[in-house]
Structure formats: C-alpha cells, structure tokens
Amino acid sequence: MATKLNKKDRLRQLKIEIDKNPFYTDDELAELFSVSVQTIRLDRMELGIPELRERIKNVAEENYHKVKAIVGSEIVGELIDLELGKSGISVFEPTPDMAFLKTKIIRGHYIYSQAESLAISVIDAEAALIGVANIKYKYPVRIGDRLVAKAEVIRKRGNKYFVWVMIKVKNKEVFRGKFILASLESDNTEKEVQ
C-alpha cells in the first residue's frame, strides 16, 4: 500500500486482505499496511480475527473430515484445502527438534512425510499406499520455515493414482515428488501395490 490509510479504511482493507489470504503473518500485514505489528494485532482483535495459527487451524478442521484414506491426525501439517480426487494444500512448520543439531536443517523424512500424507489425502479412496515415489530435495529447509505443499492428481488408471506434490518455502520450491499410489480394496490389503 503506497499511502497510509486512516484506521477505518485500514480495518476494512485488513479484513479484505485476510479474507483473500488467511495465511498472512502479522509481520507481512504490518509491512503491507506500513504500520507496526502491534497495530495489526490490535486491528485484528478489534475485527475479531484470530492470529495466524488459529486461522490455519480453523481452515484445516474444515478439511479433515473429507479425507478418506488416512485419519486427519496422521496428516503432517495442517490440511488447508482439499478437493478429493483432484488437489490439496497443506502447511507445515517444522519444530527445532526436527532439525539436525549442527546445521539446523530440517531432516528430509519430515518433508517427505508432509508430501506423502498429502498425496494419500487427495486421492478418493478408502485405503491407499505409496507404490512408487520419485522425489527431489531442491533446497535445504531450516527451522522457522513454513512449508506449503500442493498436491495434484494428474491421472487415475485403474486402482492407480498419479500424484505430483510440490513443497515451497516463500514461493521457492524446496521439494517435489511424483507418487504412484495404489488404492487398496478393504477386503484385500495383501494385493501387490505395484
């Protein structure tokens, strides 16, 4: 915003911005409106808009009931958007205990787990397993990074789902994976996955 808004206009615009993107941090909003973080927090309180973590949690809770293949609590990160059989988005903020002590870089299996659980969540099946995973870690993820994963079902052939997952930190791709998932019939879980 080029010019500073008066309080009434700022409150109105703040509501519009958070409605458009509920994942803005208070720091980002303060920069956007050229005010202090404290001013943004007071404005949010006045409008009854919860803090970022609560907004993410609220959006995620609306989506967990849609998931068929795994239990919502098994999803790594917060599931913020889900269209079964098509696409999904999750947000994950790794904690310091997930990092290597020396480098403060997040261990790869946490990043993979976010991608895997999102890939399983987006397919429209009662039970599924990863049959093939072709993954690439592109950049290190550090403590404090917020990972935004987007999954898309590219194709379905028989009981196989082809899902692409990209994970970004601040619009920079840090991980990508192509997964082939097998939908399992509930009475035949011993069937070969590939």
Curated annotation (Swiss-Prot):
Segments forming a coiled coil: none
Entry-linked SUPFAM superfamilies: Thioesterase/thiol ester dehydrase-isomerase
Entry GO MF terms: DNA binding; DNA-binding transcription factor activity
Pfam families xref list: 4HBT (PF03061)
Keyword vocabulary terms for this entry: DNA-binding, Fatty acid biosynthesis, Fatty acid metabolism, Lipid biosynthesis, Lipid metabolism, Repressor, Transcription, Transcription regulation
Record GO biological process: fatty acid biosynthetic process; negative regulation of DNA-templated transcription; negative regulation of fatty acid biosynthetic process
Record-linked InterPro entries: HotDog_dom_sf (IPR029069), Thioestr_dom (IPR006683), Transcription_factor_FapR (IPR017275), WH-like_DNA-bd_sf (IPR036388)
Family the UniProt entry places it in: Belongs to the FapR family.
Its job: Transcriptional factor involved in regulation of membrane lipid biosynthesis by repressing genes involved in fatty acid and phospholipid metabolism.
Record NCBIfam families: PRK04424.1
Name the UniProt record assigns to this protein: Transcription factor FapR
Organism: Thermoanaerobacterium thermosaccharolyticum (strain ATCC 7956 / DSM 571 / NCIMB 9385 / NCA 3814 / NCTC 13789 / WDCM 00135 / 2032)
